[in-house]
Amino acid sequence: MKRFLLCSFALVLLYPAGIDMYLVGLPRIAADLNASEAQLHIAFSVYLAGMATAMLFAGKIADQSGRKPVAIVGAIVFMMASLLCSRASEGSLFLSGRFLQGIGAGGCYVVAFAILRDTLDEHRRAKVLSLLNGITCIVPVLAPVVGHLIMLRFPWQSLFYTMSAMGIIVGLLSLFILRETRPVRLAPRDLSRSSPAAESLINRFFVSRLAITTLSVSVILTFVNASPVLLMEVMGFSRGDYAITMALTAGVSMVVSFSTPFALGLFKPRTLMLVSQGLFLTAGVTLSLAHTNTVTLFGLTLICAGFSVGFGVAMSQALGPFSLRAGVASSTLGIAQVCGSSLWIWLAAILGISAMNMLIGILIGCSIVSILLIFSVTPNRSVAEHEEIPYQSRP
């Protein structure tokens, strides 16, 4: 079991590392490529577009050909794309490399969740996904620090050499440590209930959890997107104060994420999901009534706590009905989360909604819709029947 957890964690970490590792070198990259920082900031959107593109295909390929081949190819693509970015001499080539990086990271991301669905039951999966969420919260804090230390002695290209090395390590883990977990054979009595036709992506329970996780990701990405404006322009923080504040909020996310597995031993998953949405609602109300920086910071802290306590549980429930189509389900969740959150941020910007109101709106909207879905759509018997562990059921 340890090999699956190690490989899944490594596969997921390529995604946040690809976002955060290079940011510290952005001014120097812009100068060397004769591009403005504003022009290169689109690299974030290009990276997410690459991830979404990979997710369109990676899940189905993983279900048909196996998790291991997709993981290996994804790691190789990420490694080669990182080298392409390091060799870029102008902006368009750099952005092409970023798009390919997103494709590699997206394939690995999808496979990681499919592996966890294949090897863990619902209770253990919820705990592991919560831990995984905590680990991914460490990357936005550590990656810029590591990047800064690297650039003290080496040029910005070394940041992408480091990411390329990460791709090599993940590829080697996938090649030599990871075992194939894709279900290859079911007992005859299970064929009818576990067929791809039965594992529908439009069943009410999956759609409800897809909506909850998409709204939750929209909350956290809106917070990340709006935080520079809120903290530095509205609240008057310096860059140093901003960095410290974001590090502290990441710390809150880590503490709550690492505590959630223990909470799952005491409370039902539904209870933790309701707590999560209750924290979102409280955060929205707090921010709407806040008149001091202290109260605003308290509201922002509630956002991080709410996301960390509920997201892993909701993702585990969403993957639960799928024993044969875990890859497709993981892809669908990833695409919905990336596209849904991007659509909200884009619409809010087009409509001229302020950063604070954008955040308050998604917090209150997410909490109300999610609470209604949690109460109205509960796991039924057919969902429980699909909750099998294909890898463990092999002879």
From Swiss-Prot:
Subcellular location per the Swiss-Prot or TrEMBL entry: Cell inner membrane
Keywords, alphabetical: Cell inner membrane, Cell membrane, Membrane, Transmembrane, Transmembrane helix, Transport
PROSITE patterns: MFS
Gene3D superfamilies (alphabetical): Multidrug resistance protein D
Superkingdom in the source lineage: Bacteria
Signal peptide location: none
Transmembrane spans: 4-24, 42-62, 69-89, 93-113, 131-151, 158-178, 217-237, 247-267, 271-291, 295-315, 328-350, 355-377
A Pfam family that the UniProt record links to this protein: MFS_1
GO MF annotation list: transmembrane transporter activity
Topology within the bilayer: Multi-pass membrane protein
This protein's GO CC annotations: plasma membrane
Record family assignment: Belongs to the major facilitator superfamily. DHA1 family. MdtL (TC 2.A.1.2.22) subfamily.
Designated name of the protein: Multidrug resistance protein MdtL
Species in which this protein is naturally found: Salmonella dublin (strain CT_02021853)
Name of encoding gene: mdtL
